[in-house]
Amino acid sequence: MSIKAEEISSIIKQQIENYQSELKVSDVGTVTYIGDGIARAHGLDNAMAGELLEFSNGVMGMAQNLETNDVGIIILGPYTEIREGDEVRRTGKIMEVPVGEALIGRVVNSLGQPVDGLGPIETTGTRPIEAVAPGVMQRQSVNEPLQTGIKAIDALVPIGRGQRELIIGDRQTGKTSVAIDTILNQADQDMICIYVAIGQKESTVRNAVETLRHHGALDYTIVVTAAASQPAPLLYLAPYAGVAMAEEFMYSGKHVLVVYDDLSKQAAAYRELSLLLRRPPGREAYPGDVFYLHSRLLERAAKLNDSLGGGSITALPFVETQAGDISAYIPTNVISITDGQIFLQSDLFFSGVRPAINAGLSVSRVGGSAQIKAMKTVAGTLRLDLAAYRELESFSQFGSDLDAATRAKLERGKRTVEVLKQDLHKPLKVEKQVLILYALVHKYLDDVPVHDVLRFESEMNTWFDHNHPELLEEIRTTKKLPDEAKLEAALKEFKNTFVPSEEK
C-alpha cells in the first residue's frame, strides 16, 4: 500500500486547521493565615467580592475582604486540613445553590447539599444566593391573605402574601411553634414553605422535621439547616440560600412562605466573622453593615405584579430578645425593616395564654388590607376590647368596688383571652375562626363559664360540621358572613344543646 505525498500534506493541513489551543489561565494564591474558619491568602489580586475560591484539598471558600496585600476568605467547610502555604485558586463563580421542585420534602444545608440521608437531589437549576430585590414597579400591594390558622394572629395581626412579619420574643415563648403551625395550615393553600433553621440544636431541627412529616407538611416544605455545631460562615449564608430557593418559585408565579428561625443567631455568626476578619466593631460589637445584612435579605420578600406572574414570598423572620427588651440593636433594626411584628411575652406564656401574643405591642402594617371581609367584620373591635380589658384588669387588682358595666367588660375580656388560646399543632380553618369570634362578639359566650369556653368552641365546630356545613362553606367561598338570621338561628340552636360543666 503506497501513501501519496499529496494525501499526507492534506491530512496535515486538516489537522492544523482543526487545532485549537486550549490555554487555561487560573489565578493562584498562597494561604498566609488559617484559623477559626477564616483564611488569608496572598496573590489573588483579581479576586471579586463574594467569589468562590477553591483550596488545594477541595474545600471551598468565599472572598470577603479585598485588601491591598491579601484577601480575607471565609471557609465553607472543615478548615482543619488547610495549612499555611497551601494553594488557593479563583473559580470565577459566585456562590449558588440548587433550586427547583426536587428540593421539596428534603432537608439541606446552607450549600443546598442534602443532609437527610435520602440520596442526592436531582436538580439542574441553580440561583446565586445574593440577588437584587424586586424594584418598586415590579411589586404590587399586598392583597391576598396568608391564613396562619392561629386565631390571635388571623384576627388581630393578619398577615398578607408578600408581607414581612417579624416574630419576636424571649427564648421558650413559642416562636417556633407559631411558624410550624403556620406551615401546617398551608396544606390546602397552594403554598410552598421553606423553614430555615439557623444555629438550632440538631435535635430541635429533627423534632421540627418529624412534626412536619407526621402532619404531611413535608410534601410542600423545604428545610434548610445550619446547626449550632456548623462553622459560622454556614450560619451566615443559610437565610440567603433559603430565599434564593424561594425566588425560583416566586418568579414562576407561585406563593412561598419563608421562615427564618432565627436572625439573632445569623447576626451573631456575622459578628464573629467580621471580628475575625478585623472589621471595625460598632454598637454591641456588631459590624457597621449589620442593618444591610438583614435589609437585603428581607427586601427580597415581595408580591410581584401580574405581568411578572403575581408570585410572592412572605417572610417570617424571628428575633430572640433578652428579658423582653425589644429596644436592643438587632430587634430595633429588624422591626424597622419589616411590615409589623408579633410580640410573644414570657409572662403570658407561663400564665397559660398560648400562643402568648401581646396584642398591645403586636401590629401588622399591611395585612389589614388582605384580611377577608368576614374576619374584618367580626374582629374589628377585638384589639381595642382586649387592650381595655388589660387596663381594667390591672385596675381591678386594687380591689375597689366595680360597677356592673366594668364587671361585664372584665367578664367579656376573660372570655376573649380564652377564645384566643389554642392547642399546639392544631391550626384552625378561617371559617371556624370567624364562627367562634362571631359568637364572642354577639354575646353568645357571656353566660358560658370561662373554663368551658374552649369546650364550647370544639363542640360548636363539630356541631356545625354535621348540621350546617353549608354555612361554613359559604364563609370559605364568598369570604363574607352568611345571612345573619341563619347564622344567629344556628348558633341559638347549638347553644340550647350545650351543657355547661359544674364549677371547678
Swiss-Prot record:
Coiled-coil ranges from the UniProt annotation: none
Pfam family, one: ATP-synt_ab_N
Catalysed reactions listed for this entry: ATP + H2O + 4 H(+)(in) = ADP + phosphate + 5 H(+)(out)
InterPro entries (alphabetical): ATP_synth_asu-like_sf, ATP_synth_asu_C, ATP_synth_asu_C_sf, ATP_synth_F1_a_nt-bd_dom, ATP_synth_F1_asu, ATPase_a/bsu_AS, ATPase_F1/V1/A1_a/bsu_N, ATPase_F1/V1/A1_a/bsu_N_sf
Cell membrane found in the keyword field: yes
Keyword terms: ATP synthesis, ATP-binding, Cell membrane, CF(1), Hydrogen ion transport, Ion transport, Membrane, Nucleotide-binding, Translocase, Transport
Membrane topology label: Peripheral membrane protein
Function description: Produces ATP from ADP in the presence of a proton gradient across the membrane. The alpha chain is a regulatory subunit.
Name assigned to this protein: ATP synthase subunit alpha 2
Organism: Listeria innocua serovar 6a (strain ATCC BAA-680 / CLIP 11262)
